[in-house]
Amino acid sequence: MAGGVVILLCGWVLASCHGSNLDVEEPIVFREDAASFGQTVVQFGGSRLVVGAPLEAVAVNQTGRLYDCAPATGMCQPIVLRSPLEAVNMSLGLSLVTATNNAQLLACGPTAQRACVKNMYAKGSCLLLGSSLQFIQAVPASMPECPRQEMDIAFLIDGSGSINQRDFAQMKDFVKALMGEFASTSTLFSLMQYSNILKTHFTFTEFKNILDPQSLVDPIVQLQGLTYTATGIRTVMEELFHSKNGSRKSAKKILLVITDGQKYRDPLEYSDVIPAADKAGIIRYAIGVGDAFQEPTALKELNTIGSAPPQDHVFKVGNFAALRSIQRQLQEKIFAIEGTQSRSSSSFQHEMSQEGFSSALTSDGPVLGAVGSFSWSGGAFLYPPNTRPTFINMSQENVDMRDSYLGYSTAVAFWKGVHSLILGAPRHQHTGKVVIFTQEARHWRPKSEVRGTQIGSYFGASLCSVDVDRDGSTDLVLIGAPHYYEQTRGGQVSVFPVPGVRGRWQCEATLHGEQGHPWGRFGVALTVLGDVNGDNLADVAIGAPGEEESRGAVYIFHGASRLEIMPSPSQRVTGSQLSLRLQYFGQSLSGGQDLTQDGLVDLAVGAQGHVLLLRSLPLLKVELSIRFAPMEVAKAVYQCWERTPTVLEAGEATVCLTVHKGSPDLLGNVQGSVRYDLALDPGRLISRAIFDETKNCTLTGRKTLGLGDHCETVKLLLPDCVEDAVSPIILRLNFSLVRDSASPRNLHPVLAVGSQDHITASLPFEKNCKQELLCEGDLGISFNFSGLQVLVVGGSPELTVTVTVWNEGEDSYGTLVKFYYPAGLSYRRVTGTQQPHQYPLRLACEAEPAAQEDLRSSSCSINHPIFREGAKTTFMITFDVSYKAFLGDRLLLRAKASSENNKPDTNKTAFQLELPVKYTVYTLISRQEDSTNHVNFSSSHGGRRQEAAHRYRVNNLSPLKLAVRVNFWVPVLLNGVAVWDVTLSSPAQGVSCVSQMKPPQNPDFLTQIQRRSVLDCSIADCLHFRCDIPSLDIQDELDFILRGNLSFGWVSQTLQEKVLLVSEAEITFDTSVYSQLPGQEAFLRAQVETTLEEYVVYEPIFLVAGSSVGGLLLLALITVVLYKLGFFKRQYKEMLDGKAADPVTAGQADFGCETPPYLVS
């Protein structure tokens, strides 16, 4: 357990706190009950916060209020402003922005409304305030007048005979009612009735000149007749919409056609008149009355009469009484046309612009984002002083920008003396877009643009230009996409370098919030914070108000060299850290100014109903140094030859910290509470030195340090004999600043970027050499094969080599033994032997990468780092021997000893030895089951023969092929009498077989065969077959057959009835090269036995003849005996005679005996 503690203590490294630069212990909190207080916030004038509450109901038709919040008091006061009377419900404070010189503030209310007749327009309005928050002017100076668009509306009513008088009267009432809705406007009316006759009832001039215009409708009488609709449309275009009849050139021209059916016998087609009406800009509304328009052809004709698209310009009602039901709908569409300033009835220009949705103050004047301009394509208005405003957009004809909300966010970039305007369009093509505009020849034109990648991400909803190196030129543009969705986090901010800096405008990095907040809305608010970590680079803050179930969070990202933003946040401040009541913390941000007058920048964060001011912490920069005395550990201290542990003093270490401010502030002599940790030999299992004060390898303390130099001296001890005296003792210092309640203004300092929070110093050992820096080692090496005489590849899986290394010179540093061996061997393990009264043997061996295909090497470090003077060690290194290895007939193993002393090689530092090599094989020969096992014979058959076969199979189960010889011995003669006329069938080509006769080993066959009834080559003359197989491949299988006719004349010499006929086979190979697998030698030989058994043959003719004669004689004898006994005498007559003498008996006998039962009826 003690060793484990040492590991934990000596390997411990304290992480220093560089990251937290904002104070979250004592924030300044501003709270108001006003609706949406904290929706926007801006630092202003270096001493105050201006907070927007855009939804607060200030008075009737007046929404939005600004608050002046003083950090010194923690109180907020409403700012009394006089909003323009015509700016109804403007939501003042929905956007706030200050000038770079803090001299002006622009507060906007983009929902400022104005009612024009029946329409309500949202133009927006802003207030420009001075340095004392006094009103300077409204931007724009006044709300625009209601559009005075003139309209000339002509009625073309159907007077054909298909309409009855009552319906015609209802149609006239509809005309009068519609005319009445446009009373007191600049709208003029005219009316023409058509059938096959066309009649103008009143012109625009007549309508204009009469006091009671509706009296013009009452005298109208129905014409009756056919339906010439197309002709009527052309007549209206040519006559009513003519200046002679009072039609105005500046007025929009609207034609209302009321009909109950299709045209009939009209000489004109619609194709003759509709294109001309479109060209003249006449907006046509077609009203179809009755059931006729249920037919597709009639409906198609009605759609042709109306302008495109039909859903906006064609109406159908079931009867004339229902015309009133569409009156309001038609009226609203016509009013909408009156409210627009375009030729199209379905698009707006600036009527719904919502100027001030975003804003910026530039040297050229205020810039107001106008998201609603041109059907929410968007843009921005620049208001130069004493000049008409300039509208900046992608051009109103750019259909690609429809519903893009360009101007949703606004930022200003400055590069090489040129101002650029950056506008966000988060709904562009549903993925978002950001465009940079620059001024060329007094015209603002798009220079670069970048598009979002995810649908619904709202890419471009927030923008922030960043001057990273604070040289006055914009380096980066941060683009927020707060609704960007990933499975575990929501929102992202893309970092784009300004195009003028690095060419193309493309994303350089992407910033994200913490995992686990898919609805976090990271990036909804962005601000430049200033330098809070002392690296002279601008840092940024990013809000994520949706994190932690909408409690919210703010992230701090530091600027980096090369004009970048660090990809990981340095600090994350959550709303729940500050107060459990906070909601949407981070929905608005403002930074860069010192509002608390401590010389340090502050960050203002808006939440729901709250604004919090977070102060940045003072920075300290610390320089570290360590000095040792003496500068190395003396030999007398660390060497102990008898290994008797003695605690000796190694020296002293003086640790110094020099503290000064990391950035200027107004806090005076800042003091910091420092926690420091000293560790000796960190990372080692066992430290070679300890501190005298703690008696272990670590020392921890805490001190309060002010500005200046601070030093402390510690004593170092060596508690044990030092084996590694080559690498120096490492002393590592780690320290961190911890919070101290006594800090000025309750601000505890943190380390500035670039400040040291750790230092490492080395204390070397004095070398044991005659020359001060160079030791003369004298190494020697030898080895043997641990008693092994022959290496059998495949039989010996391992090769163990016993190695002896000695040093007859001075200390040898980094002693290394390198072994070189063939590729069939591989390093497996090493085992050392410990000698008494010696240092523990330390071995570390490893295989090295192969430099040659057929050569391998391994190296062993001996007693690293020092193999001392006079030392000698013996160890055993074991190699695996591959069963597939081919090593030739001898294995050569070489070894070389070397060190870092750089002494030249000698004949003692290299050694080599050879070992004979054999290869394990596994070949076998076996008998086959289909050999002839048993033969019966009879000596009476004389020279009759029988065929017999002995079958053998040769297999090679070795991992290599080899040349073998197969020998067969077959008995063929016994005492000169033929036994077996045998031949050998060889298996394949390439196998050559020869034969020769071999005399018996023991000619006294009779004695031998009586002892054991076996006929083999020991008593018989044998035929010896010798078959050479030059290459028996791996897994080869060869069959040999000994086949021939057996003779049995020799059997009588054996005096045996049963004899075993035995053939033998044997495999041989070059035993100087190969060795049969141990324990498998029996499979190199085999034999086949055939049992020969004699039987006696009997003649069947004599047996049959004798049996027949004997049977006849026996039959005759039996017959004579029966005759003598009277067996053949008849007694029937005597029986009849006996029955006649007894009538009764005779009658009964007659009936019972003479009459068979089956004849009775």
UniProtKB/Swiss-Prot annotation:
It is found in: Membrane. InterPro entries: FG-GAP, Int_alpha_beta-p, Integrin_alpha, Integrin_alpha_C_CS, Integrin_alpha_Ig-like_1, Integrin_alpha_Ig-like_2, Integrin_alpha_N, Integrin_dom_sf. One of its GO terms (cellular component) is external side of plasma membrane. Keywords: Calcium, Cell adhesion, Disulfide bond, Glycoprotein, Integrin, Magnesium, Membrane, Metal-binding, Receptor, Repeat, Signal, Transmembrane, Transmembrane helix. Residues 1-19 form the signal peptide. A motif (GFFKR motif) lies at residues 1126-1130. Its main location: membrane. Residues 1122-1161 are cytoplasmic. GO terms for molecular function: integrin binding; metal ion binding; protein-containing complex binding. Ca(2+) 3 binds at residues 594, 598, 602. Glycans are attached at residues 61, 89, 245, 393, 696, 734, 784, 907, 936, 1045. PROSITE patterns: FG_GAP, INTEGRIN_ALPHA, VWFA. FG-GAP repeats lie at residues 21-78, 79-138, 341-392, 393-444, 445-505, 508-566, 571-631. The chain crosses the membrane at residues 1101-1121. Heterodimer of an alpha and a beta subunit. Alpha-D associates with beta-2. This is Integrin alpha-D.
